[in-house]
Amino acid sequence: MQRFTDFYASMHGGASVTPTGLGYIPMVIEQSGRGERAYDIYSRLLRERLIFLVGPVNDNTANLIVAQLLFLESENPDKDISLYINSPGGSVYAGMAIYDTMQFVKPDVSTLCTGLAASMGAFLLAAGKKGKRFTLPNSRIMIHQPSGGAQGQASDIQIQAREILDLRERLNRILAENTGQPVERIAVDTERDNFMSAEDAVSYGLVDKVLASRSEG
């Protein structure tokens, strides 16, 4: 019997593609002429070109998602990739690495919110290919301005303040392009946490359609 865990682990230097911090991960066992193959559920779904952004956006998350995007592009540059998002957000820098790679790869990247897409999670949700950005009916989407804590000498705080203001301007400009909203409205609407229902997110331009069933996609 031949048994494998993490079918695509080798492309990460032996590391799993499974999102971290999820506790018990179901395994899928497939029978073949060579015996049994066991995959964690996320590695199995990667074969179907499904990538999951689950939990906070951080360097580890970004590295895994970027690697999976590039791998799926190399597998088939003409077939769509689906990115499922259930994330409270996190690092702007890590999120921008994912965003840039989504735009860089040749396949269209379709996005789907399952639960919550907040902060950088919402930013990445809106970054999917226009016409292919979806949300489930009871999901929540939240946008706001970037936040950060500054400490140190006055000159250090000034440098960090300039950086976060530059990031806010950049994020607002990209969000305006992806939603069709004026950048002035984006600036106002992201001043504080701005929660939206699935229908509100469609009206705002963050997503294109609410999906109640797979047949509607």
Swiss-Prot record:
Enzyme Commission numbers on file: 3.4.21.92
* Superkingdom: Bacteria
Main subcellular location: cytoplasm
Query: For this protein, what reaction is catalysed?
Result: Hydrolysis of proteins to small peptides in the presence of ATP and magnesium. alpha-casein is the usual test substrate. In the absence of ATP, only oligopeptides shorter than five residues are hydrolyzed (such as succinyl-Leu-Tyr-|-NHMec, and Leu-Tyr-Leu-|-Tyr-Trp, in which cleavage of the -Tyr-|-Leu- and -Tyr-|-Trp bonds also occurs)
In the UniProt record, the gene name given for this protein reads clpP
EC top class named in words: hydrolase
Q: Which NCBIfam families match?
A: clpP, PRK00277.1, PRK12553.1
Task: Quote the SUPFAM superfamilies the UniProt record gives.
Answer: ClpP/crotonase
Which keywords label this protein?
Answer: Cytoplasm, Hydrolase, Protease, Serine protease
- Would you kindly state one Gene Ontology biological process term found in this protein's UniProt entry? protein quality control for misfolded or incompletely synthesized proteins
Q: Name where it's found.
A: Cytoplasm
Q: Which organism is it from?
A: Bordetella petrii (strain ATCC BAA-461 / DSM 12804 / CCUG 43448)
Give one Pfam family, short name only: CLP_protease
Which family does the record claim for this protein? Answer: Belongs to the peptidase S14 family.
Subunit (UniProt): Fourteen ClpP subunits assemble into 2 heptameric rings which stack back to back to give a disk-like structure with a central cavity, resembling the structure of eukaryotic proteasomes.
Q: Tell me, what does this protein do in biology?
A: Cleaves peptides in various proteins in a process that requires ATP hydrolysis. Has a chymotrypsin-like activity. Plays a major role in the degradation of misfolded proteins.
Q: Where is the active site?
A: S119, H144
- Stored InterPro entries: ClpP (IPR001907), ClpP/crotonase-like_dom_sf (IPR029045), ClpP/TepA (IPR023562), ClpP_His_AS (IPR033135)
User: A Gene Ontology CC term for this entry?
Assistant: endopeptidase Clp complex
Identify a single GO molecular function assigned to this protein.
ATPase binding
User: Which ranges does the record mark as transmembrane?
Assistant: none
Q: What is this protein called?
A: ATP-dependent Clp protease proteolytic subunit
